[in-house]
């Protein structure tokens, strides 16, 4: 019992130290005037599995995250609708140096864990590991107050809406992506410090098209 307690303390301290190695990334203000028209973006949308090794430009990352689930009104409502405005979808950005949680109110990336977890997102599908970043979508079931099947269904719908925003925004911004359900759930759940009331549902590797 004592040994288990001290092991937990050591692990927690290790996670805190890892997160402290990273800094908050304050994103640029989103450029809401750029990108192609909605109909053109929908026409261009496609699933892409080959990515350039080029790092995502800061403005592209900022605009993509805002389009996916950013705040677009003074009352704090989002670009993606959600069940009863629960705003239950969390976006984790997995970069080579570490994983971050997107804070929509601050329009910033908050450090979660240092280290490259793109392999855990790829989970054996090598093409996904070649993307310079992946966005992992998680449903926060505490917003529903229960883990019923109907609540999980609504949460999955909310995640799907954010995922579609990512797909369309990538098409409009000249980025490449593909929505995926495959990922190493156990590794990511530990790395991202997700409680049992968080559902890991979808991920989107993102990069520039290889060609």
Model-based region annotation:
Residues 31, 137-141, 208:
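Short, small-residue-rich loop/turn micro-motifs
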